[in-house]
Amino acid sequence: MVPFKLKLIPGESIFDQVVFAAIKSILAGELKAGETFPSVRTLALDLKIHPNTAHKVVQHLIQERWLMAQPGVGTVVAQPPKARAGDRKRLLEDDVEKLVVEAMRVGAGLNEVQQAVADTWNDMRGLKVVSNDH
């Protein structure tokens, strides 16, 4: 059984969505370092995706060091990789730009965007922070 949720969004790459869901699950602590990651076959069957897509997902996560292949054990979750300080900004730029464009499109202000980011951050960390803004 796949230990993470996947909400397929029409028009977006299934590969990208599965990779994102797996990484989100690792960062949220739902999948912990050392735990066995589902096999390619299990991913394909449970998520109803093509086995080639499932294979690409696992290989990508190994290449990006989110997973490790361990002979005799299978694929296991690795410690989440840390980006160097100089790389973090570059890695975030495209996604931040997309967020800002979408916020502007719907008329959200900077405070709303910051609060949404803080809420999501805290939800993923299992924290509940009460805000005075809402």
Predicted regions span which residues?
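Short hydrophobic/aromatic-rich motifs at helix boundaries and adjacent loops
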Residues: 11-12, 29-30, 45-47, 68-73
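Short, Lys/Arg-rich nucleic-acid/phosphate-binding segment
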Residues: 37, 66-81
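Extreme N-terminal segment that seeds HTH/winged-HTH DNA-binding domains in transcriptional regulators
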Residues: 1-36, 42, 90-94, 100-128, ...
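N-terminal helix-turn-helix
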Residues: 36-68
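A surface-exposed regulatory interaction patch that couples sensing to output
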Residues: 78-97
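Short secondary-structure transition/capping segments
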Residues: 47, 81-82, 123-125
